[in-house]
Amino acid sequence: MTSNPVYLLHGFGTSAARTWRDNGWIDLLADAGREVIAPDLLGHGDQDKPHDPEAYIAVEDAALAALDRGADGTTVDAIGFSMGSRTILALASVHPERFGRIVVSGVGANLFRHNDDPAFLANAIAADAVPENPAAAYFHQMARTPGNDPQALAAFLRRPQSWPITDEGLARIELPVLVVIGDDDFAGPADPLVERLPDARLVTLPRTDHFATPKSFPFIDAALDFLGAAP
């Protein structure tokens, strides 16, 4: 097993600090002797929070640039959650040579549900009143977590998609990939994603929903073991 730096990408509406640092990931990886690269995506955490959807067209390019700055040209292992997983898969489909082993969580069949409308959640987030739909209400309230900017997060969802997830792109990721999904995660099931990746294995977390995934001890254990960074 290698000692590659580990590139961590958080999910939508959160940050590197809340997803990775607060749940112990960064300390555990440091204890294993692994360098950590954990940027915030544009519109999140310490990054700028523009309100124009066009400003987010280069989200994936910025994520790749952060990887390049942190890794200085070396291969990285990667762990993503939700939007971070989608971003890592998009990057690896174009630049598989940049990655060693990949862990994605909180994604699955949702990547291929083309009738899912990001505008629905964007409108829910931007609304003044809490929506009646439970999922919309959750995202509406999550966008108002301290440090978040609801209008920036709505713009993020409305951005033009310049790095699509395609079957052809996923087939180019001829790397070991661990797919982790909670059995109560709305993003699942994960089988459609696993079937499209040449070298993937699946771990299902019992009694775990989408938002509980980053702090799941079985997830942490499985990911660190997969990367050869277990205590």
Predicted regions and their residues:
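Conserved alpha/beta-hydrolase "nucleophile elbow" surrounding the catalytic nucleophile
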Residues: 10, 80-85
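The serine-hydrolase catalytic nucleophile loop
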Residues: 13-26
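Conserved alpha/beta-hydrolase
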Residues: 29-48
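Conserved acidic catalytic loop of the alpha/beta-hydrolase fold
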Residues: 58-76
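Flexible "cap/lid" loop of the alpha/beta hydrolase fold
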Residues: 86-94, 99-129
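Active-site nucleophile elbow and catalytic-triad environment of alpha/beta-hydrolase enzymes
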Residues: 152-169, 183-186
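Short beta-strand/loop motif that positions the catalytic acidic residue
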Residues: 173, 179-181
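Catalytic histidine-centered segment of alpha/beta-hydrolase-like enzymes
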Residues: 208-220
